[in-house]
Amino acid sequence: MKLTCVIIVVALFLTACHAKDKQEHPAVRGSDDMQDSEDLKLAKKCTVDSDFCDPDNHDCCSGRCIDEGGSGVCAIVPVLN
């Protein structure tokens, strides 16, 4: 029984030492991944031009929603050179 416990402890110790050398900066990489996923969740996407929008509360990329009797369409704004 004692031999089994010693073998298990040695195996765990060797496994932990081997895995410890695999990642140089695990905390830094983990926080960067977390930040990227939070940014994606918090990023607000706008409605593209010519898609339907709500005239009272629109989120058009162009910034303009043309009211067409209750429903609206995001305005297509030409780029002037």
Curated annotation (Swiss-Prot):
What protein is this chain from?
A: Conotoxin ArMKLT2-01
Q: Name one GO cellular component term.
A: extracellular region
> Organism's domain of life?
Eukaryota
Native organism is Conus arenatus (Sand-dusted cone)
Among its keywords, does the record have Kinase?
no
**Which ranges are cleaved off as propeptide?**
20-43
- Cystine pairs annotated here are C46-C61, C53-C65, C60-C74
The region annotated as signal peptide is: 1-19
Q: Where in the cell is it found?
A: Secreted
